Amino acid sequence: MSTVKEAAHRLSKSEMSLYAVLDLKKGASPEDFKKSYSHSALLPHPPFEYHLGRKLALRYHPDKNPGNAQAAEIFKEINAAHAILSDSKKRKIYDQHGSLGIYLYDHFGEEGVRYYFILNSCWFKTLVILCTLLTCCCFCCCCCFCCGALKPPPEQDSGRKYQQNVQSQPPRSGAKCDFRSEENSEDDF
């Protein structure tokens, strides 16, 4: 790992950038991809799934290296790198955001990648915090309870209100007392 920027653009298991896997420079043209990953003269136009005619893939193909697990892994990395870097959209995302961008592209699409990196950018987080503080959104409950409609009554007034509501207290002894008067009890039936 020579630089942090290279570390951000890793996708292969061997911790090499996809350009290094294909032995290409970052600004390589599509013709360079064809040269690096070209077909043999025997099959000028093989089907899409056909990988045996490609120079780089032939070196590490599992059929050419039987029993070599490392060659099979390198072959898989070469095919994955070619699939990503030959697609212009995936290549652009890989150049901008690295392997995380490719992972997000595979799961959420191109729009998902854009929104993810916008929402995780430092300037967006700063903007959200600034707007929240300026509009008192995060202090909504505090503002409503302190000075808004849900403001509790002051201590002095609340004591008087409770004293006015209590007219008499029930007896404290264990004696049972009928709180209804006799006049009301006869009228109720």
Swiss-Prot record:
Keyword field: Chaperone, Lipoprotein, Membrane, Palmitate
InterPro entries from the UniProt entry: DnaJ_C_subfamily_member5 (IPR051434), DnaJ_domain (IPR001623), DnaJ_domain_CS (IPR018253), J_dom_sf (IPR036869)
Record's GO cellular component terms: cytoplasm; membrane
Keyword Membrane: yes
Domain J: 17-98
Compositional bias ranges of the Polar residues kind: 161-171
Tissues in which the protein is found: Testis specific.
PTM description: Palmitoylated.
Entry keyword annotation includes Chaperone: yes
Membrane topology recorded in Swiss-Prot or TrEMBL: Lipid-anchor
Region (Disordered): 154-189
Cell compartments where the protein resides: Membrane
Protein name: DnaJ homolog subfamily C member 5G
Species per Swiss-Prot/TrEMBL record: Homo sapiens (Human)
Phylogenetic placement of the source organism: Eukaryota, Metazoa, Chordata, Craniata, Vertebrata
